[in-house]
Design a protein with these regions (language model features):
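Conserved, well-structured functional cores that handle cations and Mg-NTP chemistry
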Residues: 1-140
Length: 140
């Protein structure tokens, strides 16, 4: 049985939630919200991007398939339904997510390495090229 955190929750741990909440307060994003907050919306849309979902319906099907793991992915305890997600996407201020994206890009630019040799520790290179191997088997 898996004892570690899921990869998605490990990725979202790098997001600065305090800064995101500042943008939510600035644009009053969680006003009149009962359960599906701006943070939940951000994580839901990130999950859709990272899992290569093509539509909202496809994303909701994926959430239903992972309903038991939804809390551990960081998406909360309540199921995410298409109507709620589409309403949030339509009515919430996009500037919350735009400003947060610009903030994250600024942080990434400041922390990037200009020379790979300056990074401490071991360096690994992964090659994902595929090769075609032609084999013939002769039966006698």
């Amino acid at each position: 049985m898996n004892q570690d955190k899921y990869v998605f929750s490990q990725l979202t741990a790098f997001l600065n939630r305090t800064q995101f909440n500042n943008y939510v307060r600035k644009y009053d994003g969680d006003r009149y919200v009962k359960q599906f907050t701006c943070w939940n919306q951000l994580l839901a849309m990130m999950f859709g991007q990272l899992s290569n979902r093509e539509s909202l319906r496809d994303l909701i099907v994926a959430f239903e398939a992972h309903r038991g793991k939804q809390y551990h992915l960081g998406l909360g305890r309540n199921p995410i339904v298409k109507a709620t997600l589409s309403y949030a996407n339509q009515n919430r201020n996009y500037r919350i997510f735009e400003d947060f994206a610009f903030y994250m890009m600024k942080e990434a630019c400041e922390k990037r390495a200009t020379n790979i040799l300056d990074i401490p520790g071991k360096k690994y290179a992964f090659d994902s090229t595929t090769t075609f191997a032609s084999m013939t088997v002769t039966v006698m």
